[in-house]
């Protein structure tokens, strides 16, 4: 859950998000070291008189500044590609949920159940109860079992949308006429909030997403009560 004056990411709730946080720290350290080196060289150039204005060729320096950036790019690319393949891989999902974006609400269909579908609208500010979050609460939450692989099929009925839940590391475009898929697995129960992340019209900011991750036995009770 985000909070005011937050500087970092939300707490990771899925293995993918944990990998993304590790990759962010890895890349940030590389960027910090490169920036420090560049600033150090600039400071030397500004403070020393040992310059070589007549130097026309320096094979050693050119070799270093060609090979070193290539190595750095490889160190960034390899873990990035690994995470991309992990995010794209879906093996034997335990549950499939179809998500459709509309102007300006979401529809959900549990394809493993008959007649288990609903629309999810934002609760207006005037109808919020004490303790509920403005612009983030919905009338129907997406209840899912924790510690299970869940496949989300995402599309749109009208314009471009984007189904995003930051703490799970999810951001998938909802495109009319196209079915995208992503996978999620939560390591702990709780409420996880997201929003549409693609400008889709005047009420774009009023399309919240609320996932309620619960143990399997509670999910079974909920699904039975919805049928």
From Swiss-Prot:
<keyword id="KW-0999">Mitochondrion inner membrane</keyword>
<dbReference type="InterPro" id="IPR011759">
    <property type="entry name" value="Cyt_c_oxidase_su2_TM_dom"/>
</dbReference>
<dbReference type="GO" id="GO:0005507">
    <property type="term" value="F:copper ion binding"/>
</dbReference>
<keyword id="KW-0813">Transport</keyword>
<feature type="binding site">
    <location>
        <position position="207"/>
    </location>
    <ligand>
        <name>Cu cation A1</name>
    </ligand>
</feature>
<dbReference type="InterPro" id="IPR002429">
    <property type="entry name" value="CcO_II-like_C"/>
</dbReference>
<dbReference type="Pfam" id="PF00116">
    <property type="entry name" value="COX2"/>
</dbReference>
<protein>
    <recommendedName>
        <fullName>Cytochrome c oxidase subunit 2</fullName>
        <ecNumber>7.1.1.9</ecNumber>
    </recommendedName>
</protein>
<dbReference type="InterPro" id="IPR001505">
    <property type="entry name" value="Copper_CuA"/>
</dbReference>
<keyword id="KW-1278">Translocase</keyword>
<feature type="transmembrane region" description="Helical; Name=I">
    <location>
        <begin position="15"/>
        <end position="45"/>
    </location>
</feature>
<dbReference type="GO" id="GO:0004129">
    <property type="term" value="F:cytochrome-c oxidase activity"/>
</dbReference>
<comment type="function">
    <text>Component of the cytochrome c oxidase, the last enzyme in the mitochondrial electron transport chain which drives oxidative phosphorylation. The respiratory chain contains 3 multisubunit complexes succinate dehydrogenase (complex II, CII), ubiquinol-cytochrome c oxidoreductase (cytochrome b-c1 complex, complex III, CIII) and cytochrome c oxidase (complex IV, CIV), that cooperate to transfer electrons derived from NADH and succinate to molecular oxygen, creating an electrochemical gradient over the inner membrane that drives transmembrane transport and the ATP synthase.</text>
</comment>
<dbReference type="InterPro" id="IPR008972">
    <property type="entry name" value="Cupredoxin"/>
</dbReference>
<keyword id="KW-0496">Mitochondrion</keyword>
<keyword id="KW-0679">Respiratory chain</keyword>
<feature type="topological domain" description="Mitochondrial intermembrane">
    <location>
        <begin position="88"/>
        <end position="227"/>
    </location>
</feature>
<dbReference type="InterPro" id="IPR014222">
    <property type="entry name" value="Cyt_c_oxidase_su2"/>
</dbReference>
<keyword id="KW-0597">Phosphoprotein</keyword>
<feature type="binding site">
    <location>
        <position position="198"/>
    </location>
    <ligand>
        <name>Cu cation A2</name>
    </ligand>
</feature>
<keyword id="KW-0472">Membrane</keyword>
<dbReference type="GO" id="GO:0005743">
    <property type="term" value="C:mitochondrial inner membrane"/>
</dbReference>
<feature type="binding site">
    <location>
        <position position="200"/>
    </location>
    <ligand>
        <name>Cu cation A2</name>
    </ligand>
</feature>
<feature type="binding site">
    <location>
        <position position="161"/>
    </location>
    <ligand>
        <name>Cu cation A1</name>
    </ligand>
</feature>
<comment type="similarity">
    <text>Belongs to the cytochrome c oxidase subunit 2 family.</text>
</comment>
<keyword id="KW-0186">Copper</keyword>
<keyword id="KW-0460">Magnesium</keyword>
<feature type="binding site">
    <location>
        <position position="196"/>
    </location>
    <ligand>
        <name>Cu cation A1</name>
    </ligand>
</feature>
<dbReference type="Pfam" id="PF02790">
    <property type="entry name" value="COX2_TM"/>
</dbReference>
<dbReference type="InterPro" id="IPR045187">
    <property type="entry name" value="CcO_II"/>
</dbReference>
<keyword id="KW-0249">Electron transport</keyword>
<feature type="topological domain" description="Mitochondrial intermembrane">
    <location>
        <begin position="1"/>
        <end position="14"/>
    </location>
</feature>
<feature type="binding site">
    <location>
        <position position="196"/>
    </location>
    <ligand>
        <name>Cu cation A2</name>
    </ligand>
</feature>
<feature type="transmembrane region" description="Helical; Name=II">
    <location>
        <begin position="60"/>
        <end position="87"/>
    </location>
</feature>
<feature type="binding site">
    <location>
        <position position="204"/>
    </location>
    <ligand>
        <name>Cu cation A2</name>
    </ligand>
</feature>
<feature type="topological domain" description="Mitochondrial matrix">
    <location>
        <begin position="46"/>
        <end position="59"/>
    </location>
</feature>
<dbReference type="InterPro" id="IPR034210">
    <property type="entry name" value="CcO_II_C"/>
</dbReference>
<dbReference type="GO" id="GO:0042773">
    <property type="term" value="P:ATP synthesis coupled electron transport"/>
</dbReference>
<keyword id="KW-1133">Transmembrane helix</keyword>
<comment type="subunit">
    <text>Component of the cytochrome c oxidase (complex IV, CIV), a multisubunit enzyme composed of 14 subunits. The complex is composed of a catalytic core of 3 subunits MT-CO1, MT-CO2 and MT-CO3, encoded in the mitochondrial DNA, and 11 supernumerary subunits COX4I, COX5A, COX5B, COX6A, COX6B, COX6C, COX7A, COX7B, COX7C, COX8 and NDUFA4, which are encoded in the nuclear genome.</text>
</comment>
<dbReference type="GO" id="GO:0045277">
    <property type="term" value="C:respiratory chain complex IV"/>
</dbReference>
<feature type="binding site">
    <location>
        <position position="200"/>
    </location>
    <ligand>
        <name>Cu cation A1</name>
    </ligand>
</feature>
